[in-house]
Amino acid sequence: MSISLNYSATRDPLSALGLDVGNRRIGVAGSDRLGLLATGLGVIQRRSLSEDIAQVQEWIRRRQATVVVVGIPLLADGSVGSQARKVQRFVRALQVAVDLPIVTVNEYLSTAQAEWDLREAGIPAKAQKGLIDQQSAAVILQTWLDERRASLSEVPAWQSWGNKDYAGEV
């Protein structure tokens, strides 16, 4: 089964919701209406798939999201491991539940980037624990926003990361 999760870049205002789906928590981030900046918004404590999807739907409603961006934790070589397969299952369930484009991006090293961002912001290590998931979601969403902006400005492909669909087949 293959899922098409493309979202065409336009110059229209957007409200993107970014998700970092983990085993215990889902980090949530949102974009500004211009699609320039991603900000961590909060964390969903995972309970069951149906409850998790309902919580995401509530975030979508509150933020009036027009697209959802989900990080897929590919391995260093770009292959799909067990954690990526779990996230792919979540993405398929979310696709059934919401009538919005869902885009996936490779989230490789997003947690490391989030930890670095928090450290650079002067957040003590103990305080980072509660913020890391939402900051990871912000890193994932910012990656997509940057790729989208590059495609809108018609930057040559070699200058942008490109926008791949990592939902794959399971």
UniProtKB/Swiss-Prot annotation:
InterPro entries documented for this protein: RNaseH-like_sf, YqgF, YqgF/RNaseH-like_dom, YqgF/RNaseH-like_dom_sf
Sorted UniProt keywords: Cytoplasm, Hydrolase, Nuclease, Ribosome biogenesis
Molecular functions per Gene Ontology: nuclease activity
Entries under CDD domains matching the protein: YqgF
Domain of life: Bacteria
Subcellular location: Cytoplasm
Main location: cytoplasm
GO biological process: rRNA 5'-end processing
One Pfam family named in its UniProt record: RuvX
Biological role stated in the UniProt entry: Could be a nuclease involved in processing of the 5'-end of pre-16S rRNA.
Annotated family: Belongs to the YqgF nuclease family.
Protein name from the UniProt record: Putative pre-16S rRNA nuclease
